[in-house]
Amino acid sequence: MLGNLYILSAPSGAGKSSLINALLADLPRTEVQLSISHTTRQPRVGETHGIHYYFTEHHEFESLIEQGHFLEWARVFDHYYGTSLPMIERSLAQGIDVFLDIDWQGARQIREKVPNVKTIFILPPSRAELEKRLVGRGQDSLETIAKRMEQAVSEMTHYNEFDYVIINDQFKTALTELKSILTAERLKQSAQAIRQQALIAELLAE
């Protein structure tokens, strides 16, 4: 595989979605992509098939499970969600880095199947800042925010299961650090030996 598979995880409010959106906006699709999940739930207002999700019928999703189509999948309440393995493999074969936006539990599943997956965890600079961001969204009641904070603390205990940790204090700095990880992974000897195979063969020819 020429491209790298990445998992990006974070508690709610850490800025994960903003970082990945900024990364995708700055880099061409020929270099990096976000994996689009399949789901059996109905589209919400503003969601488009093939952009936000691949909206799939229940029976079709279960058929894909039987075919081994998914790298990982889960049933949440009455709906299925899954990550398409063939789509990821096609992108990686083209030298494109692929990001998966999943939680630490999904990361564990994938790590067992893909040992060389690169994992990144985003942390907030403090609990106070995390709570401030959640309140600033203006979407939830104080009770819901308290539950989200409790869940966030639980999720953050798993940061040490990841290869890289980024503290999202200053957004531009965090984005630069995220890009640096991609660059460093691409420059590893094992990666360059594949990407630059023809050049290396020419340079070392007798």
Curated annotation (Swiss-Prot):
Annotated catalysed reactions: GMP + ATP = GDP + ADP
InterPro entries: GK/Ca_channel_bsu, Guanylate_kin-like_dom, Guanylate_kinase, Guanylate_kinase_CS, P-loop_NTPase
A family per Pfam: Guanylate_kin
Span of domain Guanylate kinase-like: 3-183
Database matches in PROSITE patterns: GUANYLATE_KINASE_1, GUANYLATE_KINASE_2
Enzyme Commission identifier(s): 2.7.4.8
Transmembrane feature ranges: none
SUPFAM superfamilies the UniProt entry points to: P-loop containing nucleoside triphosphate hydrolases
Main location: cytoplasm
Keywords: ATP-binding, Cytoplasm, Kinase, Nucleotide-binding, Transferase
Claim: Kinase is one of the keywords in the record: yes
GO cellular component, as recorded: cytosol
Locations listed in the record: Cytoplasm
Stored SMART domains: GuKc
GO molecular function: ATP binding; guanylate kinase activity
Binding site for ATP: 10-17
CDD domains, alphabetized: GMPK
Family classification: Belongs to the guanylate kinase family.
The protein's role, per its UniProt record: Essential for recycling GMP and indirectly, cGMP.
Protein name: Guanylate kinase
Species annotation: Haemophilus ducreyi (strain 35000HP / ATCC 700724)
